[in-house]
Amino acid sequence: MKNVTVKSLAVEMQISVDHLVQQFSNVGFHKTARDYVTQQEKETLLAYLKYELSNTPLTLQRKTRSTLNIASTSGRSKSVQVEVRKKHIYIQPVAHDSILTIKENILPNNTQEVKNNAEASPKTKFILTPKQQSKIAKNNIVNNQNNLIKKSRQISEKAILEAKAAELKHQAEEETRRKVEEKARQIAEEARQFAEHNDSIWMTTPELAEDDTIDDNLSNYHYASIVEDENNRKIENERRTRGNKVSKQKTYRLSEFKKNREEARAVGRSSKSQSKRKSSTLMQVFNKPSQVINRDIVIGEMITVAELANKMAVKGSQIIKKLIQLGVMATINQIIDRETAQLVAEDMGHKVILLRENELEESIMKDRKIDSSVDNAESRAPVVTIMGHVDHGKTSLLDYIRSTKVVASEAGGITQHIGAYHVETDRGMITFLDTPGHAAFTAMRARGARTTDIVVLVVAADNGAMPQTIEAIQHAKAAKVPIVVAVNKIDKKEANPENIKNELTKHGIIPEEWGGQNQFVNISAKYGTGINNLLDAILLQAEVLELKAIRNGIASGIVIESFLDKGRGPVATILVREGTLHHGDMILCGLEYGRVRAMRDEQGRHLSTAGPSVPVEILGLSGVPIAGDEAMVVRDEKKAREVALYRQGKFREGKLARKHSAKLENMFTNISEGGILELNIILKTDVQGSVEAINDALEQLSTEKAKVKIIGSGVGGITETDATLAAASNAILIGFNVRADASARRIIDKENLNIHYYSVIYHLINEVTQAMNGMLTPEYKQDIIGLAEVRNVFSVPKFGLIAGCMVIEGIVKRHNNIRVIRNNIIIYEGELYSLRRFKDDVNEVRNGMECGIGVKNYTDIRTGDIIEVFKLIPIIKSSN
């Protein structure tokens, strides 16, 4: 076999070159890194290494784990994990006699042993020369002898050190004992001398002398205990510095003296001795920080006062004081917003770190990013919103467009009015949105203007611009949406389109023929006049706008309307803005999420896909979304659920914060609200937009005298839960385009609840206003109708005391209220129950006639009194 160098052998054995050279030197070969190694030398080195490994001591480590239950000061047991580690080293014992045997066997006959070992291990075949074998044996014998000598020296030195330590420890204990006894004797001698010096004074009052003796003994024991504790502390410090364990026997601590001291304390315990007694070492003591600690306060979107106080390590009352200084009234459990919490924390000297809690939402938005470059964009249909005042013909116009452009023979027909339609024309598709015209639906009109591309403003030619017409113009201008004016009802005789142009010019709507940018189209929704011209004007405006959208990609849109269907669950109408919505997509819609289980258009036809500008009705959401929420398709269902739950919690916290927020300037107003009457209402409507509109309208009815309180509101029919809540809260049930189910009707009949159904918002608002007026305490006006002067008083057995009177003014009627006036002072107010003229009962007596008047439950009538007769006229009150 070819020889190798020492360096290459070291690489092969995976050790350093220096270490391998040292191993060769131990065997007896002097090598360098560049020298060659023969096969025989390698075998010799291998045998040596094997021999060294056989003499390595075997070390065994054991770990034992256990649990100890330790009783704490509070009475609870505490579990402590204990681990015991044991280490054993196994070394083959080598006796002194065996050294000679090894020497005799190795020196002359080591060649045979090496040969036998080589045969026993066929993998390592080597031959040692006699000189090498003798050298190895001598080295081993010398090493064993040196190890034995070192061990014996270590044992002897350890024994000497332990003996010296024990002697020093004993001397220290004796010295401490001597000093303590000497100090105690000195204190006792001083006390005795002091007692002899004042013996004459103490003997005069034996009881006082006895008490003072006890106090003196206590004082002596107190001083002795201080000295003893000082000595114990010194011994403890010495023990810690030496690192030695103190003996468990504490005889050097004067146990007899401690026993006497405890007995003396039991005999005469006083408040002075108790205050001077040292506190237990187990007692926890809180040290107030010497300087203010500035912390890093992490604040999220919302935080309660208690949480902010915990983060700042201060009391909640300090936070409340600071909030009052800032003009905010808050309780310890109230939620405050991020800005207010930041002001409080920075004012108190802390550093504020604002937490971004919407990172998950941002990650979802990044994950669903699509290629929105202009090259991939395609032309899309315009979204047109029809706006105008109520009864100006918006819905009639939309119905005519649908009836002429939608094929009547399609199966299913129109199944549900969802407020959004798309129609096909010769020049392309148009999507229409219908918005209500009543003032209560302001939010819906604003939402429609934000969603739309073009606004068609319907104005009646016989009525002109009305408040909702002006409001629609304002919404369209705020959204920067072009306006096409449709002058409706031109078939009427009173129609005056030119007057409409003049009125709208005042609000910034100028016709094109007058140099403006707005198209005016004269139409008749009843007869279809000018409808095609209107559609052409809409498509022309869309071409000018150059509307484009990404068709291929993840879909996103906006919720136009939503409601709860009893058979299908939550239903949402979504207008797709970009991308393509597919059946089965996971969609995140405001506070709700879900998979699209079904999708259909405004005619009830099932769809598998929906592109941009197409309104669709989808099923499968976890709840009813809020109209106006943004809907987007996401890839991960888990992330969609987490984002929806986060938004729900954030919405709930914000709602709670708005509900409980009270400014300092409104404090006295809130305190004086006890006398305000409340009209509790539970509102259920057919669609989400109506809930918002009616809620706003009813809240605006609240006044200083009466307040409308919406206990609950929602979408869908009136259920048993709603009826139970109305019975518990004494509320009125209002259904807008919905009805109560059978179980709810049973509770309504049983509890005799007040329920009202409406389909027109005018009627709802008027009747709620009347109900608020009926809640107010009735007021009456006193109308004086007559005066009678008492001329004589006589008694009648049947009626009691009767006053003979002369009517001097007005008329006196039976069963009216009266006042008895004497010397211009009212002395009685009651009811007139008997009125006679001569012997006949009469209902009234006029001016200048005599009559007899019987006053109910009053007998102190005198001659000359004036009886004033008046009636109460109720005053019709208004809640305004």
UniProtKB/Swiss-Prot annotation:
Residues 488-491 are annotated as: G4. It is found in: Cytoplasm. Residues 413-417 are annotated as: G2. Keywords: Cytoplasm, GTP-binding, Initiation factor, Nucleotide-binding, Protein biosynthesis. InterPro entries: DNA-bd_dom_put_sf, EF-G-like_DII, EFTu-like_2, IF2_assoc_dom_bac, IF2_II, IF2_N, P-loop_NTPase, Small_GTP-bd. Gene3D superfamilies: P-loop containing nucleotide triphosphate hydrolases (3.40.50.300), Putative DNA-binding domain, N-terminal subdomain of bacterial translation initiation factor IF2 (3.30.56.50), Translation factors (2.40.30.10), Translation initiation factor IF- 2, domain 3 (3.40.50.10050). Transmembrane segments: none annotated. GTP binds at residues 388-395, 434-438, 488-491. Residues 259-281 are annotated as: Disordered. Residues 379-548 form the tr-type G domain. Residues 434-437 are annotated as: G3. One of its GO terms (cellular component) is cytosol. Residues 524-526 are annotated as: G5. One of its GO terms (molecular function) is guanosine tetraphosphate binding. Residues 388-395 are annotated as: G1. Belongs to the TRAFAC class translation factor GTPase superfamily. Classic translation factor GTPase family. IF-2 subfamily. One of the essential components for the initiation of protein synthesis. Protects formylmethionyl-tRNA from spontaneous hydrolysis and promotes its binding to the 30S ribosomal subunits. Also involved in the hydrolysis of GTP during the formation of the 70S ribosomal complex. HAMAP family: IF_2_B (MF_00100_B). This is Translation initiation factor IF-2.
